[in-house]
Swiss-Prot record:
This is Sodium/potassium exporting P-type ATPase 1. Induction: Induced by a combination of high pH and sodium ions. The gene is ENA1. PROSITE patterns: ATPASE_E1_E2 (PS00154). Gene3D superfamilies: Calcium-transporting ATPase, cytoplasmic domain N, Calcium-transporting ATPase, cytoplasmic transduction domain A, Calcium-transporting ATPase, transmembrane domain, HAD superfamily/HAD-like.
């Protein structure tokens, strides 16, 4: 019975297009079944009526409507976060009680927070437009028996499409005919080489077939690299493989609305639970507690916590006044509440990240989403694509084996097209012997001299059975000489190798050789041959191709004399091929023979490619970037695990992973079941349930033949283990995982626009090493964020304690007099502290920042305790300063109505506020300098240097000039604020002072002494605790420790 085809009536995404639904996969069907299923005809195609009818059912062949930038959504995102909402509530209350000055200052702070965030997010906002640009604009379709070019959007299932070299495939095709057809699917599957197609292949229903292995299919947005073909359209729009990826990008995994599955006959209770969960999600989304990076979520929770603490303190204020709430009490309550809110934190954080993003541009990293920069500091797992990221994305000859001569090895070749770069070494043994021997066999750097005759014969084949070109050109910009190549990637690699040894086609042909014939590479035959005649009249056949296809044409080989090729000899050659393949190399064989053109027909391929003499093998591969191994090692040293998720074959993936250090070089020392977990094929991983994956003692380091969903599941598995994950990729197939990861990192040079749109960060040089630059900058920012969060929150703690204790100061009318006015509180929090906090955000990274473990959180116990300690000591110093002024030299008179204006009798209170304000300001500024290092003394932040303390202090302070001038400027700003008329007594509610300056300075110095004493205590404590485990660093920096330590009993069987 022929499988049926149906159409879904509704589009779950609200698009006009309707989805094709089939009961069987086209790649499992014969061509005849596909023709019948899609109601088409190979010779005539669809009729216009059929095409019109199907277009009405399935819709246009595109990926949906444009998503435009939503100004309102960006603005709402800035307003609806907990920190800003708390400030807005304070603003409303201040205006409600007609405290215009405080309300104006709070309003300005709210505006700055919203404006800065809005501008930054507007710049980063991207659309899905580039995804649609991948579609082929035109397609060559057969309709009504006539070939015609139609708009690709009008292609429908059942259309007969013709494709040729250079075409972008307009839809998913089931191939019905192809000639040497190869398609580049790197952006879709991650496969580094073009995929040879075979329309006659049919797959059974027994096992799942990854997209990259469906050789009878050609996929939408792939590019035809070689040959031509014809196919039946089996999927369009969002039903194509690329469409499925686009659909997954559009679907919001963190949907706010919880839907009820009506097919399960839900009860009223189910609907009620869904409503409760939806309401909870909406509230948490508005407050920002379940969106954004870990730091943003923690800050949102912090804002909520501080809001309720502020409410509690406000209630305490009112209770202390026996609930007699008048304007004075309300102002004091607002003042206490504001002292708990780090008003400048959001804007400082945003500006610091914006500056960090500008710095990253100089390090080949473009930050699309500022949030991700802070998030990089906490990354402890990187899932990386292979092709073009860890590797160069170009092919290089790695090894050559000539029987009875030995093996040649190419090393240090980091310029694929440059034959002058790199070293060739030699070993007289075969690849099989080198692999199997227990001895360390070194390759000697000197090649045999003179060149062995068999190697010379092989070089002639490699040079003449090759149509790739290699040329030197002059760079127009700087005049330097560069190498460029044209042709098949495999042939270019061989050409570069032979040119390296002085063998080029022009030199060999010259005036001595005549090209008689050529049989091009055919995907069904998998070999190519050329025939040349020399000036003596002798003709020679030169052949190269897939090992099994060349061996089938060979009758002889040299062992060491020319001898017949037996079955044992072929098995030996195949074992050497397997040895090269196990290293991740693509292996080709080479053969030749002399041909008598007077007796044999050189136009007959079967005749020419017979009775050949086998001469050797070559192994080529896409080599790792020179810096990849070092970068992976640094990642391990930084406590970051690196996983390779690639569409390539297992052998290639495993070999590259070992070469760059993702897998241990001594993999043979590990038990078989451990290696099975370390290296898995996507089908193995995908066959496991989430529970089975979670029960694995460790997650795989390498997964080969990855489909997009495999990468997403790997990231989800890491998330379930509490990991913070970065994902790198360049292809369309990487987009869902880039979006799913905590930080998505796309390639800028060769990456698809789709991947860039789904990413948070783009590498402009496609270099894995640049990820380390991003992580280093992320860690620097996380460290600096920790510093200014400590500075700002310690000030909040100090002000809250100061004002709460200040409730004890009761004036003549029985109301509390606040020892700092609301504007003084806001001035210290917003103006005085804001710029030094930005300065802390620009601190340079410590020299060992990549040798430290990832920053799991900003709010460590050390930071929390520091916050309380510094805040308490600052409050004590400033409160004692106020008391000394009012009750020491003063008579203790607190006047009346001093919270609103400078009435009679308020002079002493105003002078006390001025002294305390100066002390508070200067203590806060010194705290900024103290926060440069959480433990080291302010006077010796670099103990490894031998400079005198005063000289080193001057160097350290001047090193961050923004922070230096911010602190100095804020120190000086106290004087005009205290002395300028009207501003002092009407706005700040304080008065000019004299001897009180001395007290302010004295208590500032006392705060500095206390802070230094606290740091000294911490250094002693951590020195003792860190001395307990001297081998900790060695254990922490062993990336494979957990793989080598889990026992056989808790290892899961992988089948």
């Amino acid at each position: 019975m022929t499988p049926s085809i149906g159409y879904v009536d509704e589009d779950e995404n609200g698009q006009k297009s309707k989805f094709l639904r089939s009961s069987d996969d086209p790649y499992r069907l014969s061509i005849e079944e596909v023709i019948e299923k899609f109601e088409t005809h190979l010779e005539n195609g669809l009729s216009d009526e059929q095409a019109k009818s199907k277009l009405a059912k399935v819709g246009l062949n595109n990926l949906g409507a444009d998503e435009k930038i939503s100004i309102s959504k960006i603005l709402a995102h800035q307003i609806f976060n907990a920190m800003v909402l708390v400030l807005i509530i304070s603003l409303i209350i201040a205006l409600a009680i007609k405290d215009w000055i405080s309300g104006g200052v709070i309003g300005f702070v709210v505006f700055i927070n919203i404006f800065v965030g809005f501008i930054q997010e507007l710049k980063a906002e991207k659309t899905m437009g580039s995804l649609r640009s991948l579609s082929s604009p035109m397609a060559r379709a057969l309709r009504n028996g006539v070939d015609s070019n139609i708009n690709a959007e009008e292609v429908v299932p059942g259309d007969i499409i013709h494709i040729k070299v250079g075409d972008t495939i307009p839809a998913d095709l089931r191939l019905v005919d192809c000639m040497n057809l190869e398609t580049d699917e790197a952006l879709l599957t991650g496969e580094s080489l073009p995929v040879a197609k075979d329309h006659e292949e049919i797959y059974d229903y027994g096992a799942p077939i990854p997209v990259g292995d469906r050789l009878n299919m050609a996929f939408s947005s792939s590019i035809v690299a070689k040959g031509r073909g014809t196919g039946i359209v089996v999927a369009t729009g969002l039903d194509t493989e690329i469409g499925k990826i686009a659909k997954s990008l559009k679907n919001n995994d963190d949907a706010v609305v919880v839907k009820v599955d009506k097919s399960l006959n839900p009860s009223t209770k189910d609907y009620l639970i869904a409503v409760i969960k939806t309401t909870k999600n909406i509230i948490f989304n508005v407050l920002g507690t379940n969106v954004g990076t870990p730091l943003q979520r923690k800050l949102s929770w912090l804002a909520i916590l501080l809001f309720w603490v502020a409410v509690l303190f406000a209630i305490v204020v009112m209770a202390s006044q026996e609930m007699r709430v008048n304007r004075n009490v309300a102002i004091y309550a607002i003042c206490v509440a504001l002292s708990m809110i780090p008003s400048s934190l959001v804007v400082v954080l945003t500006i610091t990240m914006a500056i960090g993003a500008q710095v990253m541009v100089t390090k080949n990293v473009i930050v699309r989403k500022l949030d991700s920069l802070e998030a990089l500091g906490g990354i402890n797992d990187i899932c990386s694509d292979k092709t073009g990221t860890l590797t160069m994305g170009k092919m290089i000859a790695r090894k050559v084996w000539i029987p009875n001569v030995g093996s040649y090895l190419v090393q240090n070749s980091n310029e694929p097209f440059n034959p002058t770069v790199g070293d060739i070494s030699f070993n007289e043994n075969s690849p099989k012997f080198i692999k199997e021997t227990d001895d360390e066999l070194d390759f000697i750097p000197h090649l045999p001299s003179p060149t062995p005759i068999l190697f010379e014969k092989w070089l002639h084949i490699a040079t003449l059975a090759n149509i790739a070109s290699l040329n030197q050109i002059q760079n127009e910009m700087d005049g330097s000489i560069e190498w460029e190549a044209h042709g098949d990637a495999t042939e270019i690699a061989i050409n570069v190798f032979t040119t390296r040894l002085g063998y080029t086609r022009d030199k060999l042909i010259g005036d001595s050789l005549e090209h008689l014939n050529e049989f091009p590479f055919d995907s069904s035959i998998k070999r190519m041959s050329t025939v040349y005649k020399d000036k003596d009249g002798n003709s020679t056949v030169y052949t190269k191709g897939a090992v099994e296809r060349v061996l089938s044409c060979c009758k002889y080989w040299y062992n060491p004399e020319l001898t017949a090729l037996s079955e044992e000899d072929k098995l030996l050659i195949e074992s050497n091929m397997n040895a090269l393949s196990s290293e991740g190399l693509r292996v080709l064989a080479f053969a030749q023979r002399e041909i008598n053109i007077s007796k044999e027909n050189v136009s007959n391929r079967e005749v020419v490619e017979s009775n050949l003499i086998f001469l050797g093998l070559i192994g080529i591969y896409d080599p790792p970037r020179p810096e990849s191994a070092k970068s992976v090692k640094l990642c391990h040293k930084a406590g970051i695990n690196v996983h390779m998720l690639t569409g390539d074959h297992p052998g290639t993936a495993k070999a590259i992973a070992q070469e760059v250090g993702i897998l241990p070089h001594n993999l043979y020392h590990y038990r078989e079941e451990v290696v099975k977990v370390m290296v898995m094929i996507a089908n193995e991983f995908d066959s496991l349930s989430d529970d089975e994956i979670d029960n694995l003692p460790v997650l795989p380091l390498v997964i080969a033949r990855c489909a997009p969903q495999t990468k997403v599941r790997m990231i989800e598995a890491l998330h379930r283990r509490g990991k913070f994950v970065a994902m790198t990729g360049d292809g369309v197939n990487d987009s869902p995982s880039l979006k799913k990861a905590d930080v998505g990192i796309a390639m800028g040079l060769n990456g698809s626009d789709v991947a860039k749109d789904a990413s948070d960060i783009v590498l402009t040089d496609d270099n894995f090493a640049s990820i380390l630059n991003a992580i280093e900058e992320g860690r620097r920012m996380s460290s600096n964020i920790q510093k200014f969060v400590l500075q700002l929150l310690a000030e909040n703690v100090a002000q809250a304690l100061y004002l709460m204790i200040g409730l004890a100061f009761i004036d003549k009318s029985g109301y509390s007099v606040f020892p700092l006015s609301p504007v003084e509180v806001l001035w210290i929090i917003v103006v005085t502290s804001c710029f030094p906090a930005m300065g802390l955000g620009q601190e340079k990274a410590s020299h060992d920042i990549l040798e430290q473990p990832p920053n799991a959180t900003i709010f460590t116990w050390e930071v929390i305790i520091d916050m309380i300690a510094y805040g308490f000591w600052m409050a004590v110093c400033c409160l004692v300063c106020f008391v000394c002024i009012v009750y020491g030299k003063g008579d203790g008179s607190l006047g009346e109505n001093c919270n609103e204006g400078s009435d009679t009798g308020c002079n002493l209170v105003f002078r006390g506020r001025s002294g305390a304000f100066a002390a508070f300001t200067w203590c806060a500024l010194l705290l900024a300098w103290e926060c440069i290092h959480l433990r080291l003394s302010f006077f010796k932040m670099r103990p490894e240097l031998e400079n005198p303390w005063w000289k080193q202090l001057a160097i350290d302070l001047w090193d961050n000039q923004f922070l230096f001038w911010s602190v100095m400027g804020a120190i000086v700003s106290v004087f005009p604020v205290v002395y300028i008329p009207v501003i002092n007594n009407k706005v700040f509610l304080h008065a000019p002072i004299g001897y009180e300056w001395g007290l302010a300075v004295a208590f500032t110095i006392l705060f500095l002494i206390g802070a230094e004493g606290w740091k000294w205590f911490k250094r002693v404590y951590y020195r003792k605790s860190n001395a307990n485990n001297p081998e900790y660093d060695l254990e922490r920096n062993d990336p494979f420790k957990e793989y080598s330590s889990f026992s056989k009993s808790n290892t899961m069987e992988i089948v």
